[in-house]
Amino acid sequence: MLAHATLLRPTPLSARARVPARRVASSRRASARAAASAASRPAIVVLPGLGNCTEDYDDFAAELESRGFHATVARVIRPDWLRNAAGLADINYWRGTLEPRPTVDWYLGRIADAVAEAKAASGDDRVTLVAHSAGGWMARVYLNDYGVDDVRALVSLGSPLNAVPKGVPGVVDQTRGILTYVEANCATPAQLGIPVTCLAGRWLEGRESVEGVRDAAGFLVGQGYKQVCGDAAAWGDGITPVATAHLDGADNVTLEGVFHTPLGSSDDRPWYGTPAVLDRWVEKLRVA
């Protein structure tokens, strides 16, 4: 773009006259080829999960780039998540009826910035949102309030997308009502009118009790599952139960043996963005 802008800078007539026509034509062809090349690389915007930062997704973004996509990760640093503490000042937090806005307005702004950046850098007119963990429900809020004109598809990775069940003993809604609001007020996949794919990992089954050392991990994970879906014996990716990561009306996919997060992932504990796992769902990103 800078080189093209230089060509448009006012120049004395005599200097313009010395530029051969074939050079101008060649420059135009090169610009057209560059634009076509950019447009042929679909733009992906990766949305970090709760507690994560942009750099956590460097390897994932590089893998997407190697497969022909233009990847942009929304700019988030870990201290940004402290902004969510603003919700504590809202009486609805304590009532369990908290709404996502204005508490997560800062994150919605980061999505908007990343979408604009991706479009400008790739030459693509729309992007696919790939939302990890809590980024999934925040993507739903974004699409509901900002619209879908700039977005061609949404893919969520282990995102909690359903309201926490009420009336289950020992269960406290960790979102303080936000997921209930999202479920009741945000557009469904059918209403959005764009492809929505929800990926869930089936890495570890939770346990309701500890019957031995081998059950300890399942018990600890199960207590987390219970706070999200009401069932400690559910299957999930270690953080999000399968049932919570799937959304009515979406293309719901369960990935066997997949862990929740890039932090702590390995060949033995692959997450959604591990190359071998990405092989299993990358076609969901190739939408018209």
Which residues does each predicted region cover?
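Glycine-rich "HGGG/HGxG" loop immediately N-terminal to the catalytic nucleophile
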Residues: I77-W94, R140, P165
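Serine-dependent carboxylesterase/thioesterase catalytic core
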Residues: P48, E65, A71, T97-E99, ...
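Proteolytic processing junctions in secreted/extracellular precursors
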Residues: A3, A30-A38
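Short aromatic-enriched loop/helix-cap "lid" or pocket-rim segments at secondary-structure transitions
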Residues: D58, R83-L88, P165-G170, R207-V213
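N-terminal chloroplast transit peptides
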Residues: M1-R23
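Short, surface-exposed "cap/lid" segments of acyl-processing enzymes
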Residues: A39-R83
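Short, solvent-exposed loop/turn segments at secondary-structure junctions
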Residues: L50-N52, R78-P79, G136, P160-N162, ...
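C-terminal catalytic-base region of ester-bond hydrolases, centering on the histidine
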Residues: G193-A288
